[in-house]
Amino acid sequence: MQIIWDETKNHKLMTDRGISFEIFADIIINKKYIDILENPSRPNQMIFVCTYNNYTYSVPFILDKDQNIVLKTVYPSRKYHKLYGGKSYESKT
């Protein structure tokens, strides 16, 4: 299993939001995410909830046919920031 993403989208994230998939891939690989949720608006998609720079981010993803995690986008989430209060991860092991 690998974590993959679209490089064009990654460049756009770096330009527009000052973040990158690499940052969140590292958080995910090290199991430092807060939660994994079903995406209520997309039936085959899940969301990693992560903290970065003291703010809560949503990282929607899918699993491809080879069980790779395909990151779709990253965005700051007021909804999850209110819900989780900006807390950092708890060990997932």
Predicted features and spans:
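Ribonuclease/tRNase effector modules and their secretory precursors
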Residues: 1-93
